[in-house]
Amino acid sequence: MGNLRFYNTLTRKKEDFIPIDSSKVRLYVCGPTVYDYAHIGNARPVIVFDILFRLLRHVYGKDHVIYARNVTDVDDKINARAIREYPKLTLNDAIHQLTERTYDQFQQDTEALGCLLPTYQPRATDHLEEMRSLIERLLEKGHAYIAENHVLFSVNSIKNNPLYGVFAKRSLNEMKAGARVDVAPYKRDDMDFVLWKPSTQQEPGWKSPAGISVLGRPGWHIECSAMSMAKLLTPYGGGLACDDLSVNVFDIHGGGIDLIFPHHENEIAQSCSVFGTERMANFWMHNGFLQVEGRKMSKSFGNFITIRSILESNFVEFSNAMTDDLKQSWAGLSARFSMLQTHYREPLNWTAQRLAQSSSELYRWYELLRCERSCLDNGGVIDASLISTLSDDLNTPNSFTLLRKFYKEENAVALVQGMDLFGLLRQEWVREIECPLFVKGIDLDSKFIDQRIAERLLFIQNKEWAAADEIRNELAKKGIALKDEKDSQTGERITTWEVK
């Protein structure tokens, strides 16, 4: 087995990853709320944890990793959007239309981004019984209470638990000041949060737990506790019925850094209180924030970008022979390529230039593979240095340095295996001779770049420095960085280039 080390948000340090059971490595990631098109901020955790899923499958075997990513299909934002978009339908029918349409679109978008399907994609509305069971257990143990047909989690019931608040690195007073809590007279404490709430006659509702007579719907946090239990604990060891506490803990929980508080803090409180464990998951991994052109992404700033808009944009000049499906697949892999050049825990600045440059570099990689089509038939052994680098807390920037090295060395076999590991390979684009070229234009022609470098070297020999600098600047604007050095054998000046 490979030596995997990941940064654990729970301990704030990198640790060796040792699964509870290497024959069933278990990963849970918070997924979409299906009320609107997914944006590029949503795309980042989808891509990041797809890379983790691929690495775990490589190390432990494809059949020995369980990846669950939930779908939230009950939410007040869903209700409001459904009423607005389907005013002529009943609310339940409108919600069904909206959530099905949005879910299908999310599936198409993530496929275009090169992501594998998770093992499970549980929907909240399919796991209401598990939610009710968890809530009733919390009531029995004194960690929850009923008030005005709501069920609320009592934070004071576990305030002596050393884990509560440690995850978010906040004191109770800090969390009270910073949390977006509903001001409600029925709460015993401002920090208490909703496990279940009543529905009006106009809102969707289901049978409530603990004999509450009115219909209701779950709170946000209980959904993930229930769905992770259903898919990672119950089939594995019996979930609630199992006395072995270690079985009621899974290996990795992932999500965006914005979910640390209150969502993940409250998930931990719920699950640990039900199962009597000190941990919900042994590792917590979080991806960093995403900005657009140096600013927070916001509709008010005019920089709100959906995955769909990227897939349908002409950010490079495409070949006329390309179909719309092929263009969208190319755009999706270019976006994936672009995101993976930043370490998952670091902030990511999304720019149009960065996307175009990623497309340019990816295109050249495919040029090499298409010239060496036999690379597809040379076994499936991935370069050990690539696995070692990725195993160090998913270090994709250093991994891409190795992929660029393979490209420069024209090592098509190592490059194709690396691209496959990172979800960047479409074998049919390499194998099919008649597959149309993906992009066109002199900007992406390596022969043109080599020609301009030769012209620049001639200008340097003639001491025409301004003309030489003009070529360097011209290529820099296209994302091409030049590096001047001396040949170790002849001492002559040589110039190499790479995409930045």
From Swiss-Prot:
Keywords: Aminoacyl-tRNA synthetase, ATP-binding, Cytoplasm, Ligase, Metal-binding, Nucleotide-binding, Protein biosynthesis, Zinc. It holds the Pfam family CysS_C. ATP binds at K299. Its main location: cytoplasm. One of its GO terms (biological process) is cysteinyl-tRNA aminoacylation. Zn(2+) binds at C30, C224, H263, E267. A motif ('KMSKS' region) lies at residues 296-300. One of its GO terms (molecular function) is cysteine-tRNA ligase activity. Binds 1 zinc ion per subunit. It catalyses: tRNA(Cys) + L-cysteine + ATP = L-cysteinyl-tRNA(Cys) + AMP + diphosphate. Belongs to the class-I aminoacyl-tRNA synthetase family. This is Cysteine--tRNA ligase. The lineage of its organism: Bacteria, Pseudomonadati, Pseudomonadota, Alphaproteobacteria, Hyphomicrobiales.
